[in-house]
Amino acid sequence: MRGLITAALALIGLAFAAPQPTLWVQPDDGVEPLIQLIDTAESSIRLKIYLWTPSRMDVVEALGRAVKRGVEVRVLMEREPAGGRPSMEVISALRDRGVELRLSKPFRFVFVHEKSMVIDDRVAWFGSGNLTGSTFKANREYMLVTERPDWVREIARVFDADWHGQRIDLSHARLVWSPDRVVRGVREGNAREKVLGLIRGARKTLFLEQAGMVDEEVIAAIEEAVARGVDVRLVGSPADPKENTYFVPGAERLRKAGVRLRYLPSPYVHAKVIVADGNTALVGSINMSQSSMNANRELGAILTAADEPRAFFRLLRTMEADWKNARPDNPFLLPPVEGVIPWTEAPKYYGRVVTVEGRIAQVESRTGVAFLKFDTTPDAFRLVFFPRVYGEFDQPFPEAYLGKKVRATGRIKIYAGYYEMIINSPSQLEVLP
């Protein structure tokens, strides 16, 4: 009898359990699931985004279709992403399709860096990914999709407050929010508290996949974790530390403290994840920086292996695969590769200076850039030229190089998922007999 009662109570618990969130992984899953999600909207869409480029006009079109169905669509966009301006092409296209659009209020936050969407007050989408080409093609991103009512309500409630430029009390938030500060008695977020709590609470392991590592308090907390015997692993993308100080210097400092550090060349790590003791994870848009935790609008969620197993274990499997594929050395700090390599092997040497050889199969000239491609396939390795140097090369440029066998020397980089070498001088390019 007791067994039957226990089983019945278990079934009741399952019946009332919160719906399981789903984890979308980029670039694995692509943009189509997002388009399909938008196409389910019947009454309302709230979309908040940091960066939206013209390469994601497919999302614009999906929102336009929603408007035609009678859906109320509101978009709140950061007014100065990365210190620049939002795409006027995207803004015009949204407004032309009947989308109600507002830019973030000046001085309210440093950046509205949150990426989220609520559909019909029923389902929410949020995480690290912007609406760009690289998000769905070249970056490691994690996005959560949830029908959990308390999460959906909270994201919608914060959207409405930000839409009107109003403060909102998040002292009892279910999710993780920035900015973590108190203004005029209002607790606006909890991000720093949650990040440090996860790190300081770790007993055996910490596993981080991060785009940035610049916050002094976070770095110190990780160093303290290592000192108390916690095994800490950190994965990020390699970069020239002279050009990009957002990840490499902090990561290398942690390596010296005993952190096991690896660099993942591809996909580019734009993720912001902490996993503690193999059972609790923080996923979202929150970077390891003072601005992200204390001055931006950001959003994340805590997942546990016990409560959100489907999303949690997909996250962990992906991170373990990235760890396996990552390298211990930053290739930007390694010496040039000796000898000449075929162009097909260029991606193996991302971050390093190499000399490649091959025949130019396609040339392309766009506004502000020209390409010499070694193959006609879209993802073929390419040489990149900017207008200031066009006159220094064989004319007519770039057509003069079509069909020519060339040898090029430079550093292998990735842009929006394309492996490439930037050519700044004729000394880098030799035409062979």
Feature roles, as predicted:
Residues 3-14:
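Sec-dependent N-terminal signal peptides
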Residues 1-4, 338:
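Non-membrane alpha-helical secondary structure
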